[in-house]
């Protein structure tokens, strides 16, 4: 069994996927727009992302533009990235922080040589944890 996060974006999924390609080296394995699906797309969603799948390291993350009504609910989550060393932690944290908000600066903790939390410019919360 695997847990695969699915991220819903407010009409900026394509931009987010491209950002993760640059910031995290994400490898896109699939990207389909609503206009390419078998059914007629919701009005105004033709060029938005119906489904994207990309790899970050060995993990698969999926995403799309949310065409459903805006709902509020559970928001208590972060994506945690385990990185090999402090240099990778600094690079990854810095890349995700561009246009985002640092929630906890990258620093030494009792459990990690470098740990930090950042909300990227799309509002996705990330925890960067150095494992060595």
Predicted segments — roles?
Residues 7-58:
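Core segments of cupin and vicinal oxygen chelate
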Residues 3, 29-30, 50-55, 63-72, ...:
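Vicinal oxygen chelate
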């Amino acid at each position: 069994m695997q847990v695969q996060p699915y991220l819903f974006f407010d009409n900026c999924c394509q931009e987010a996927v491209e950002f993760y390609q640059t910031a995290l080296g994400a490898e896109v394995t699939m990207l389909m727009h609503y206009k390419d699906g078998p059914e007629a797309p919701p009005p105004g969603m033709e060029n938005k992302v119906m489904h994207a799948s990309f790899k970050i390291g060995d993990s698969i993350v999926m995403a799309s533009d949310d065409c459903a009504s805006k709902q509020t609910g559970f928001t208590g989550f972060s994506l945690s990235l385990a990185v090999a060393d402090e240099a990778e932690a600094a690079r990854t944290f810095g890349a995700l922080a561009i246009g985002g908000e640092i929630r906890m600066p990258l620093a030494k903790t009792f459990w990690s040589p470098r740990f930090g939390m950042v909300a990227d410019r799309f509002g996705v919360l990330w925890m960067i944890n150095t494992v060595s």
